[in-house]
Amino acid sequence: MMTDDIYDTDPTDAPDPKTVCPFKICVDSREQTPFHFLSIDPFTIVPLHHVALSTGDYSISELEDRITVERKSISDLCGSITVGRDRFEREFERMAEMQRHPLGGFACVVVEGELSEVCRHVAEKTRLSTDSLLGTIDSWSIRYGVHWRFCPGRRFAEIQTLKILHQFWRQDQKRLKELKELTSQGKAADE
């Protein structure tokens, strides 16, 4: 019997609910080498939804206007800061707008390489100076308030991306719970 569920209809086949990610990750449909988020502690199953995101490569379903993670390989980053600089800066402008959301927002660039590797790549393979690269990263961090995570490799970047999304989701759930409690207290006081 074929189903659209993540598991067969036999409830004994269902995964432990604690191991299923409680939110759906939106993956930009234009992402060329997307993360799959397979077996990243504490989750064994992470629901994914491929969709054209207006900003970034990863977000949370129904929170796409508030959270984004832009994934970059080392060569992607160098190309984005040199040849694709104007386009990349427009992306930062959109990420900055997202962070100003009234309910709170977060934007981050996750790089599949440590900063020292990025600097070495720039020195060896581009005409961009290391000082220019670092100046751009620092300047854009300050100007747009976008966070950067330099990770030792792709798998670590994938784990970091899931952890960022999960932490944002948890804090958002906590905020929603507090708002509901305040609302119910206000209704009780009115009665």
Predicted regions: what they are:
Residues M1-E64, D76-E191:
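Non-catalytic C-terminal interaction segments of nucleic acid-processing enzymes
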